[in-house]
Amino acid sequence: MVKIDLITGFLGSGKTTFIKSLCESLGVINTMSSPTYSIVNEYNTNFKYKIFHFDLYRLTSEQELFELGFEDYILSNNYVFIEWPDLAIPYLDSYLRIIINTENNNRYLRAEIIKSS
C-alpha cells in the first residue's frame, strides 16, 4: 500500500482542502490547518498511525528538507501527504501523485501510482 501521496496543482487549486478531506476520512482527531508556515503538521488518528502533512512551497534546498527530518517521516510507516513536492521526489521510491487542475470553476483530479524500478 502506498502511504506517501504527493498533491500538485496551482496556487488556490484546493490542495490543502483535498488533504483535509483525506485526513478526515482517515480518522484524524485533532484540528487541521495548513502547514504553509510550519512546513509540516502532525495529526493523530483514531487508529494506530499518524498523518504528516507537508507544504514544501517555501523550501529552497534539499538541505532544508533534510533539516526537517524528512527521511524519518517517510520511513515512519505513517501516512505522508506532501504539497509542492518537487524537492522530495528524488528521495521517494513509490508514491501516489494526485494532480489537481481547475477549469471554469471546476476541479479535476488525476491520480498516478509511481514506483521506482
What are these model-predicted stretches?
Residues G14:
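Conserved glycine(s) of the Walker
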Residues M1-I4:
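Pre-Walker A (Motif I) flank of P-loop NTPase domains
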Residues I51-L59:
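Switch II (G3) loop of P-loop NTPases
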Residues I7:
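Hydrophobic anchor at the beta1->P-loop junction of P-loop NTPases
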Residues F10:
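P-loop (Walker A) phosphate-binding loop of NTP-binding proteins
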Residues E24-G27, Q63-L65, D72-S117:
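Short phosphate-coordinating micro-motif centered on Lys-Gly-acidic
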Residues V28-Y43:
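Short beta-strand-centered segment that lines the nucleotide-binding/catalytic pocket of NTP-utilizing
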